């Protein structure tokens, strides 16, 4: 048996007295500080580059870690700011229309409740106070000079000041002593901007998009030339025909209809008059659609995506540089003689300290020696900075994360008894997973039978409802066994376990409340809402597909793609929020039962009246319909008629150009390339796992990466050519 590099005794009683990274950096030995920095770098957490070289580095790091420990509060406040838009009463309602906004059916409003004026002010003041602390806290670890020279900090401060002024103006507006008219509020827009600036992934995506703006505008100009030229040909060609008399009545009308035809939303309706007059006219429209949709659109996508990858490579390179800077700082702490190299014994001391953290596990001397020799390019039994960075990366990727000792370790007589060890061994075994999968299948059958009987209003559904209640407590038992076996912290690391935990408890509590609550309580006595949660629980059946070889790669790829896509989907959501605020400001209140013009529009004809911009929830749903291009010209033409101006069309055209032609196409292209890249990685790992029997018999398995490591590997593999360019290694992001 291999001798471990670090024995269990050196971990401080099973790791319960772990050294906090912040304490190690501020008060630890050079090796403890270096280990904490390496651990931070491997976690993808970067201390601000400016404070790494400060003489007060330890004290600055202490305040930085205090700031990061409050991340949950900061994050909740970001979302609270954003969600306030959904619960604020629309500003047009403050003008006291007749009837009032309380008549939701008259204005086709959403069902979310509105905050009162007093509640809204209190909400804004609380979130603003937290935001002020969050904005100015970095001065404690960056220092005033660095803080006020950062453009990001200056923009944040400007947004906070604007938000403060807006809240003050709103307060004066609501008071009886001030003005009684407020035409505009900037707060809904500033909240979204603060949300973007405060979340690094969204901020990086915004920087990425701004970097490719020039390329996008160039290709957009080419698209405009194509559209203008094709519209001119159509206007001239059909001038004296029925098409020209009814549809292409002017060049502006022709341009408008040809733009919609470019999106195929009005195909073939727009050219039916021409087709009736001459079947040969279809040749023009068919060629236009083929060239526009299948050539010009894809040309735009190809050019934009190429620019996108170039900008993304710069960001990935920047993150690599941040990680390398952290590792260089750690290397400098170990290299006390400033020789530019460290030996194997110094590395061993470093990794002894790394066992205090969760990222890197215990490593045998033999395994560490093999890795060290493999990366020692000069064969002098010493490694330089470059080799040190490779060593840390190899350790992080080759070995699994160390499990955090369970709290039940405090009761060794029970936890380490023979019965307990047998139980924990069973929970860790595949048989336990098979048993839960079998129960899931039976539960799925029960849900199908119960819902079918419920639709048929059969009294036979009662026993099946009881069965679902029993299944709920079986899942509670499963959850308890996993927590007992792995410990809560290890259990909670897995996203699937978090999903199971939340859904299981909500269902069990809801079902219990339904059984014991009197029928007078309509919310709990009505179990319809629980049925949707039961269907959510059935999503766990997707895991069964992981056992099927032909589906395993697809499911694993999908799971990996989710976190890498979130910044781009989040950016689309933020753009929707900004456009929703504009829509409520410009179009709010136009859709109402007393507007005679409304019932002459296509919104009324198609029964789309609920999809309006009268409040924020309805506006977001309407924008989603525009995003997926579902009859989107209906809203554009209807609001043109309701406002009586062509300028309203710019709102919808700009939305199409930004969200659909740019953002949504980028997401589609990214998914396609990332999917095939992930399949290649899966195939490589499969081949590597079959290379030798020695690798299959390793005590710690290769390729067991964390989610962040898989995303990082995916991006580096996907952007390999771009990252290899010289400019990527020197670009300043």
UniProtKB/Swiss-Prot annotation:
Biased composition (Basic and acidic residues): 686-695
Name this protein carries in UniProt: Two pore calcium channel protein 1
Gene assigned in the entry: TPC1
Self-association state and partner proteins as the record states: Homodimer.
UniProt topology in membrane: Multi-pass membrane protein
PROSITE patterns: EF_HAND_2
Domain notes: Each of the two internal repeats contains five hydrophobic transmembrane segments (S1, S2, S3, S5, S6) and one positively charged transmembrane segment (S4). S4 segments probably represent the voltage-sensor and are characterized by a series of positively charged amino acids.
Annotated organism of origin: Arabidopsis thaliana (Mouse-ear cress)
Impact when changing residue 454 to N: In fou2; shows elevated LOX and AOS activity levels and an increased resistance to B.cinerea. Strongly increases oxylipin biogenesis in response to wounding
UniProt-listed PANTHER family: TWO PORE CALCIUM CHANNEL PROTEIN 1
Assigned protein family: Belongs to the calcium channel alpha-1 subunit (TC 1.A.1.11) family. Two pore calcium channel subfamily.
